[in-house]
Amino acid sequence: MIELFTTLNPWLKAIHIVSMTIFISGVLAASFSFKIDLDITENIHIPVWAQREYRWDQIMTTPALFITFASGLIIAIHGQWFSSKWLPAKIAFVLILAGIHGFQAKLLRQIANGINVRKKQATLIILICTISIIVLAIIKP
């Protein structure tokens, strides 16, 4: 089993990084969409972009989140990192990002259905969490 993990570990890491990149890109795109929406006038038909953004979220961002979770969990288990001090901090930042994504998905669904909602932009929080996750994963303090 250890030999299998040793062989698959580089692939798991690659899958983890690619899926994380897709997930973060989707969350940032939604955040930027909310910013654009806040800046434009009410005369523009908003649900069209929201439907497209929501569809993208369903087919790309959400699956990437689950693939990131699964591959990260496998890597952490086989790397025996659950006793390390940096992993809980990384998981906390990941959970914050997952929560932001859930909130964004809800807003996108409501906007796509024509419901007028108040949108919040979370770009700075997303960037801080992403940078923190990357630093913790590389440095492993």
Feature names for model-found ranges:
Residues 1-141:
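Polytopic transmembrane helical bundles with strong interfacial aromatic enrichment
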